[in-house]
Amino acid sequence: LWNYILKSITRIMDYIIYRFLLIVVILATIINAQNYGVNLPITGSMDTAYANSTQSEPFLTSTLCLYYPVEASNEIADTEWKDTLSQLFLTKGWPTGSVYLKEYADIAAFSVEPQLYCDYNLVLMKYDSTQELDMSELADLILNEWLCNPMDITLYYYQQTDEANKWISMGSSCTVKVCPLNTQTLGIGCLITNPDTFETVATTEKLVITDVVDGVSHKLNVTTATCTIRNCKKLGPKENVAVIQVGGANILDITADPTTTPQTERMMAIIWKKWWQVVYPVVDYVNQIIQTMSKRSRSLNSSAFYYRV
């Protein structure tokens, strides 16, 4: 009888131990799992996700960056204008030191590795009919969250898996050429050994978002001395960024997929004449804009932010 009881206790203990070890293994697998795209070993960093802000005064513990072209400060021509603007934001509840004014030279310069430092980021972008495509690409870049890996185009062929997969090039001068390949890795309408026969998709640009036929391998040629190219996956809207289009008769459509409804959600429009007439409405409506955004979020909900002033 004693041996039977001892064996029963041993079997029960073994069962408990094995179940515990199984649970530990499963949890360890889940915790250490990486988020890979389909055939895309993309490991770039992501911002911490937050829920949409519903606080009445998120600015008391947050930072706001307002990016503006140098043209604005040149026209205003007032050495004290930033202090004035800081005092105006204070009337809306933003403490001194929580609002940062950041100047950029032009759209092309801002397109090269744009850095959005604050909890909330508002980018003033003056409309220019000669730069519509550049503006659309920049807006697509900064209004969305991307996971990217460097590409070694000298060793490998690359293909895009779906509409969210793009190749993003940045630099002082980017010329991008592509050669689609068949299943025998022979060029379709081009010779893989002769870049002059490749199809040119961009010439001497600072920002290029390349979209090719999904599921087809490509040989690429890029001016790597002045440009970097990355294999990127669009995760969804970057909800702590808003682009405020200054002027222009039409809202720019930044939708990459031509079969979908144009992406022009959440727009604000006022008649633009002078830069002070742009700045004043931004101060007036800043809290309403912030309430529709999320603090450092990459939520996959459809809520990209594109405004026009």
UniProtKB/Swiss-Prot annotation:
Keyword Metal-binding in annotation: yes
Record's keyword terms, sorted: Calcium, Capsid protein, Disulfide bond, Glycoprotein, Host endoplasmic reticulum, Host-virus interaction, Metal-binding, Outer capsid protein, Signal, T=13 icosahedral capsid protein, Virion
GO molecular function: metal ion binding
Residue numbers spanned by region CNP motif: 148-150
Covalent S-S links between cysteines: 65-118, 148-232, 174-227, 179-190
Glycosylation sites noted in the Swiss-Prot or TrEMBL record: 52, 221, 301
Post-translational modification: Intramolecular disulfide bonds. N-glycosylated.
Binding site for Ca(2+) 1: 78, 189, 197, 199
GO cellular component, as recorded: host cell endoplasmic reticulum lumen; T=13 icosahedral viral capsid; viral outer capsid
Cited InterPro entries: VP7, VP7_1, VP7_2
Pfam family membership, one: VP7
Domain of life: Viruses
Family: Belongs to the rotavirus VP7 family.
Other observations noted: Some rotavirus strains are neuraminidase-sensitive and require sialic acid to attach to the cell surface. Some rotavirus strains are integrin-dependent. Some rotavirus strains depend on ganglioside for their entry into the host cell. Hsp70 also seems to be involved in the entry of some strains.
Oligomeric form and interacting partners: Homotrimer; disulfide-linked. 2 Ca(2+) ions bound at each subunit interface in the trimer hold the trimer together. Interacts with the intermediate capsid protein VP6. Interacts with the outer capsid protein VP5*.
Protein name, as recorded: Outer capsid glycoprotein VP7
Lineage: Viruses, Riboviria, Orthornavirae, Duplornaviricota, Resentoviricetes
